[in-house]
């Protein structure tokens, strides 16, 4: 369990501010707002590094400590030195960035809930898609913060550890118990799944095929006319939400519900062809990207040049954070 404190983490202050009335006057503004949320989530302080292969994996001791010595703050994280200034900075930034993402979701949800469906090129389907994804991202971010900043359900003491923020602007910040937070997360996920189902399940299940959802290509008749509807694998699609629900239920120790959600994802098909090809370890060695089994991913275009390329140019595996992560990974 991590601790953090801040007073400005519920503000939305983009560097390229656009008047809110202008932004939400057109359907394209809602698209831009949603894309901005995904972009913020790809920041290195969140899924661009620390919530994927960085801080979280170091805490889980997925790296060899002798190689982490070159990373400084990550080596301190490995040793659980939570009072160290650098480690405190990691924790504080994850807290503030996480709730800033939530604030952006709430702003979008607040506006789209009252928007006329005719503003959108895809009318009701597009409105529901954007609305549902924003709800799902709000739930996802709260769940991640709950896992980091509250005790697990194994040792839950019934105390309130984090706020669940579902309004914009924020009037009051109320902290809730694990059980209360999980109930709110579940409600958001369920409503989000209902909303995105119009596109992903009812009207255009073909867009969830691998070639369309991950590559943006495929059989001509399967391709959406508008690229906004393509690449559903990089967005909170119906099956991504269902998979996150399975993860949430596992954490909550509701194993029957977790199994049900997992089974739905695993058995999902289009014209008797599985959406996701979950490969074994031998096949994984042939396909390092393993993109056919990806249910949801966040795009971070610079990760190759920022992390892997410096390592390839430095055979010693020293001097860059990317190199140290590659060398330290426990194979």
Question: What residue ranges belong to the model's regions?
Answer:
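Sec-dependent bacterial lipoprotein signal peptides
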Residues: 1-5
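Membrane-proximal, proline-rich intrinsically disordered regions
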Residues: 7-59, 262
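Conserved, well-structured interaction surfaces
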Residues: 31, 72-149, 171-180, 195-196
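Hydrophobic-face positions in mid-chain alpha helices that act as interaction patches
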Residues: 32, 211-214, 219, 228-238, ...
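Flexible helix-coil transition and linker loops at the boundaries of alpha-helical arrays
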Residues: 115-125, 195-216, 224-232
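Short coil/turn linking the two alpha-helices of tandem helical-hairpin repeats
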Residues: 146-153, 200, 251-253
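Alpha-helical solenoid repeat scaffolds, predominantly canonical TPR units
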Residues: 181, 188, 195, 261-264
């Amino acid at each position: 369990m991590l601790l953090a404190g801040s007073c400005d983490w519920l503000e939305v202050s983009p560097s390229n501010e656009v008047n809110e009335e202008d932004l939400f006057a057109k359907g394209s503004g809602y698209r831009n707002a949603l894309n901005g949320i995904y972009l913020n989530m790809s920041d290195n302080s969140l899924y661009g590094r620390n919530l994927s292969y960085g801080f979280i994996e170091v805490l889980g001791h997925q790296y060899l400590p002798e190689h982490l010595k070159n990373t400084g703050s990550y080596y301190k994280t490995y040793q659980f030195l939570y009072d160290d200034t650098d480690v405190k900075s990691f924790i504080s930034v994850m807290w503030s960035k996480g709730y800033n993402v939530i604030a952006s979701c709430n702003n979008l949800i607040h506006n789209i809930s009252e928007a006329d469906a005719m503003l959108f090129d895809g009318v009701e389907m597009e409105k529901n898609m954007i609305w549902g994804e924003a709800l799902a991202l709000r739930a996802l971010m709260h769940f991640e913060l709950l896992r980091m900043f509250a005790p697990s359900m194994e040792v839950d003491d019934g105390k309130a550890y984090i706020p669940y923020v579902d309004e914009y602007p924020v009037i009051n910040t109320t902290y809730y118990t694990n059980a209360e937070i999980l109930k709110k997360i579940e409600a958001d996920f369920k409503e989000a799944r209902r909303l995105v189902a119009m596109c992903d399940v009812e009207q255009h299940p073909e867009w969830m095929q691998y070639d369309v959802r991950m590559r943006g290509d495929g059989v001509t008749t399967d391709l959406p006319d508008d690229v906004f509807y393509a690449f559903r694998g990089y967005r909170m699609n119906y099956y991504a939400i269902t998979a996150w629900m399975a993860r949430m239920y596992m954490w909550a120790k509701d194993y029957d519900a977790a199994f049900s959600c997992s089974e739905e994802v695993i058995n999902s098909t289009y014209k008797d062809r599985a959406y996701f090809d979950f490969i074994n370890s031998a096949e994984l060695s042939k396909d390092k990207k393993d993109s056919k089994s990806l249910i949801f991913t966040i795009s971070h275009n610079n990760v190759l040049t920022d992390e892997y390329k410096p390592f390839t140019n430095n055979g010693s595996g020293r001097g860059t954070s990317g190199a140290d992560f590659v060398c330290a990974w426990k194979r």
